[in-house]
Amino acid sequence: MNATLTSLFNIFGILGTLLTLAALLIWIERRLLGFWQERYGPNRVGPFGILQVVADAIKLLTKEDWVPPFADKLVFILAPTVVVIATLLAFAVIPFTPYIGIIDLNIGLLFFLAMSSLSVYSVVLGGWASNNKYSLMGALRAAAQMLSYEVFMGLSLMGVVMLAGTFNLREIVAAQQDMWFCIPQFLGLVVFLIAGIAEAHRLPFDLPEAETELIAGFHTEYSGMKFGLFFVGEYLAILLISALIVTLFFGGWQGPWLPPLVWFFIKFSFFVLFFILLRAALPRPRYDQLMAYGWKLMLPLALLNLVITGAVVLALDGT
């Protein structure tokens, strides 16, 4: 009974924390973008505008729950929920500390890759069900982009698996006791970081929803809370990729003096802020440049990292 209560507390505690962080991240991003662009961010609702997110949520909840008459109603309604559920499920295998985490899977890394793949269905179904040419074009862009960069993401993680000898995320963190994998796996880290940005549809890789080209991409026809779910899903993806980078390459919760959860949060916050800085600093490339960049540069780098890591592991095992 106690084990069940502990598990439920973990699940709902982590779920509530993640949704709160996603909402807080929206406010932090808007404030930082305002600061970097020398303008005011949200500063009217609550102290420093921190309640602006609550005001936006109320606005979305009170909007008419409208479905276009030409849309496939059932698929149109279900699509936004898929991205949020898939992203939250991927968090289930993240070990925040030795004791805080939802489930300890031996195939945790594969589970993450499987859940991140499900997000593609949400985008494609949402674009297709809208029965709008801009939505469909955005959905097809997103499918090609996400499927392509998932290949590079998966290959970049195989070097970590070779060094740790496991797909279990807790054991991968434990394997970094002496040295974080960001040093021997620097190439893998670079590839994973760039692929993660593309998976989350963040600038400079937000081409599926490029406003100047496709109005709003795959969620052009969405409004109200259905649009809000896509919006929350994007920020949850930022949190997920940041948490994975910390876990796989920067020793997870490990660090001197401070409690494990504090160390995890410090590293995690750094990468979340890095995602926001990218939005402020980089332009959006053309779609053909994005795909060429992936297949002509990212794939060779991921394969090179795999070959070098395999050779080093084999040589060390031989000695």
Curated annotation (Swiss-Prot):
Signal peptide: none
A GO biological-process term: aerobic respiration
Alphabetized InterPro entries for the sequence: NADH_UbQ_OxRdtase_su1/FPO, NADH_UbQ_OxRdtase_su1_CS
Keyword entries, A-Z: Cell inner membrane, Cell membrane, Membrane, NAD, Quinone, Translocase, Transmembrane, Transmembrane helix, Ubiquinone
Segments passing through the bilayer: 8-28, 74-94, 107-127, 147-167, 179-199, 230-250, 258-278, 297-317
UniProt keyword Transmembrane helix, yes or no: yes
Entry annotated with the keyword Transcription regulation: no
Pfam family, one: NADHdh
Any single GO CC term annotated in Swiss-Prot or TrEMBL for this entry: plasma membrane
Protein localization: Cell inner membrane
Catalysed reactions, semicolon-separated: a quinone + NADH + 5 H(+)(in) = a quinol + NAD(+) + 4 H(+)(out)
Enzyme class: translocase
Membrane topology: Multi-pass membrane protein
EC number: 7.1.1.-
GO MF annotations in UniProt: NADH dehydrogenase activity; oxidoreductase activity, acting on NAD(P)H, quinone or similar compound as acceptor; quinone binding
Similarity comment: family membership: Belongs to the complex I subunit 1 family.
Subunit structure comment from the entry: NDH-1 is composed of 14 different subunits. Subunits NuoA, H, J, K, L, M, N constitute the membrane sector of the complex.
PANTHER family: NADH DEHYDROGENASE SUBUNIT 1, NADH-UBIQUINONE OXIDOREDUCTASE CHAIN 1
NCBIfam families: PRK06076.1-1, PRK06076.1-2
HAMAP family tied to this protein: NDH1_NuoH
Main function: NDH-1 shuttles electrons from NADH, via FMN and iron-sulfur (Fe-S) centers, to quinones in the respiratory chain. The immediate electron acceptor for the enzyme in this species is believed to be ubiquinone. Couples the redox reaction to proton translocation (for every two electrons transferred, four hydrogen ions are translocated across the cytoplasmic membrane), and thus conserves the redox energy in a proton gradient. This subunit may bind ubiquinone.
Name of the protein in its database record: NADH-quinone oxidoreductase subunit H 1
Native source organism of the sequence: Nitrosococcus oceani (strain ATCC 19707 / BCRC 17464 / JCM 30415 / NCIMB 11848 / C-107)
